[in-house]
Amino acid sequence: MLDQGVWAEVKVGGEHLRLFSEQNALGVQASVYNVNTKSWIAPSEAVEDIEQGKDRAAAHAMAYLLRVANAELPPLSWKKSRSA
């Protein structure tokens, strides 16, 4: 069950990613989801807090976009996640 968290959406050069930094029963985790391929680029990774999760998710997304689309990560607009 989600306690709290944030997410951001990125659409660049044909890529569509969702970045997450969330606190749940397992702790605080960061992850990056590829909407186009319906797969996780960076599955849940344990982090210290929501802010560190945002940084880790952004770093994974930035590396992915440079590698596959030769594109920069645009400024992120983080939104609050809905809790269950």
Name each model feature, range by range:
Residues 1-29, 83:
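Short N-terminal "domain-start" leader segments
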Residues 33-84:
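Mixed-charge, Lys/Arg-enriched low-complexity segments
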